[in-house]
C-alpha cells in the first residue's frame, strides 16, 4: 500500500471518483461523509466508510487518532445560489468544517493535505484563460469560502510543516453528478432529456464554462498526492488550476446533449442567478508542469458517457420504485 488516505465527501460526485482513483493506485482509503448530498452506494468497494459530519468531533478525532498520511478534503456545500441565499450556512460547512478536520490532521499523522478548491475564487474580470496568479475577486459567498479555505490550508502548512496542495477546479461533470443546480448543468440537461422535460437555461445561455471530466479531476488528485511540493511562499505557490482552458457556452451544451439524446429540445430561459460568473476558462499549464497532469477526456467523449449514466440511473430508480419492487421489499 502507498499509505492511508481520508477522503472527506467521498460519497459525493467528485469525492467518490477520487476515492476510486486512490484505491486503483493502491492506497488504503477511508471515506467520511454525512450523506447530506452524497450517496452510500457511491462509496467504492474496498473503502472503509465513516458516516459523520465534517464539522463533528468524530471527524476531528478520526484524523487525530488514525494513521492517515493524506487528508483529501472534498466535503463541501457546492451550490453557488444557495451560498448567496444563506452565506452563514455556506461558511459553516466550507470553512468551519475545513478547520475542524485541519485541527484533527495536525494532531495526527497527516503529512499532506489535498484541498478541493474552485475557479470561483477568481471572479468576473480576469483575462481568459485565467492563470493561478490572477487577482482574486469572488462574486459569491461560495467563492469567498473557497479562497478562505486556501488561506487556512496554506497557514497550516506554514505553521505545522504539512505539505499542502490546492486544486482549483473549473466546472466538473460526469457520472454521479447531481442534476440539481447550475454546477451540475450537464447532469441537469441530461436528466431533462431523459425525462422529457424542457432544458432550463439561466440567462441568455451565452455564458461560458470550462468543462472538465470527473475522471481527469480524479487523476489530478492522485498527481497532487505524489508530486514534489514547491516552497510555500504565497497562497498561489501550491495551487493548480484543473481545467481544459477552453470555453463552452451553456447553449452549446444544450445543443450537444440534445444531439447525444437524439431529441430536439428548445431551452426554457429563466432569469440569471446571483453569484454566477459570466465567462470562465482556466489555464492549466502549471499543473502540466508541476504535476505532470493534463485533461484527456474531451466533451465529445465525456458528454455521451454522462448522458448514458443518467439514463441508466433513471432506469435503476424506476426499477427500485416500481410497484412490484416495492412489494418485494416489504415481504
Predicted regions, residues:
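Hydrophobic alpha-helix immediately C-terminal to the catalytic Tyr-X-X-X-Lys motif of short-chain
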Residues: 148, 152, 156, 189, ...
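Short alpha-helical
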Residues: 13, 38, 78, 180, ...
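N-terminal Rossmann-like NAD(P)+-binding domain of SDR-like oxidoreductases, especially those catalyzing
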Residues: 1-172, 225, 305, 313, ...
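Conserved donor sugar-nucleotide recognition element shared by glycan-biosynthetic enzymes
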Residues: 141, 149, 182, 250, ...
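C-terminal substrate-binding subdomain of Rossmann-fold SDR/epimerase-dehydratase oxidoreductases
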Residues: 191-331
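Glutamine-centric residue-chemistry signal
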Residues: 74-77, 177, 207
Amino acid at each position: 500500500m502507498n499509505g492511508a488516505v481520508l477522503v472527506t465527501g467521498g460519497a459525493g460526485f467528485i469525492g467518490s471518483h477520487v476515492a476510486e482513483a486512490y484505491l486503483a493506485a493502491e492506497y488504503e482509503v477511508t471515506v467520511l461523509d454525512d450523506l447530506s448530498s452524497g450517496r452510500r452506494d457511491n462509496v467504492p468497494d474496498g473503502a472503509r466508510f465513516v458516516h459523520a459530519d465534517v464539522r463533528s468531533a468524530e471527524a476531528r478525532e478520526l484524523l487525530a487518532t488514525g494513521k492517515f498520511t493524506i487528508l483529501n478534503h472534498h466535503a463541501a456545500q457546492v451550490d453557488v445560489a444557495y451560498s448567496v441565499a444563506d452565506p452563514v450556512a455556506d461558511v459553516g460547512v466550507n470553512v468551519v468544517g475545513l478547520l475542524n478536520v485541519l485541527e484533527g490532521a495536525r494532531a495526527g499523522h497527516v503529512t499532506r493535505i489535498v484541498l478541493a478548491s474552485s475557479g470561483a475564487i477568481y471572479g468576473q474580470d480576469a483575462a481568459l484563460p485565467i492563470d493561478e496568479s490572477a487577482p482574486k475577486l469572488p462574486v459569491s459567498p461560495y467563492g469567498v469560502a473557497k479562497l478562505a479555505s486556501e488561506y487556512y490550508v496554506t497557514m497550516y502548512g506554514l505553521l505545522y510543516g504539512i505539505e499542502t496542495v490546492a486544486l482549483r477546479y473549473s466546472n466538473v461533470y460526469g457520472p454521479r453528478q447531481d442534476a440539481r443546480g447550475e454546477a451540475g448543468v450537464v447532469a441537469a440537461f441530461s436528466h431533462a432529456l431523459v425525462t422529457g422535460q424542457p432544458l432550463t437555461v439561466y440567462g441568455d445561455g451565452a455564458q461560458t464554462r470550462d468543462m472538465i471530466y470527473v475522471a481527469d479531476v480524479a487523476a489530478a488528485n492522485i498527481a497532487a498526492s505524489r508530486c514534489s511540493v514547491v516552497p510555500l511562499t504565497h497562497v498561489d505557490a501550491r495551487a493548480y488550476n484543473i481545467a481544459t482552458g477552453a470555453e463552452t457556452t451553456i447553449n452549446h451544451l444544450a445543443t450537444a446533449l440534445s444531439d447525444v439524446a437524439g431529441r430536439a429540445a428548445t431551452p426554457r430561459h429563466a432569469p440569471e442567478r446571483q453569484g454566477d460568473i459570466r465567462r470562465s476558462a482556466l489555464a492549466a499549464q502549471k499543473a502540466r508542469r508541476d504535476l505532470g497532469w493534463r485533461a484527456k477526456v474531451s466533451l465529445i467523449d465525456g458528454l455521451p458517457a454522462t448522458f448514458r449514466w443518467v439514463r441508466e440511473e433513471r432506469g435503476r430508480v424506476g426499477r427500485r420504485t416500481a410497484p412490484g419492487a416495492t412489494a418485494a421489499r416489504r415481504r
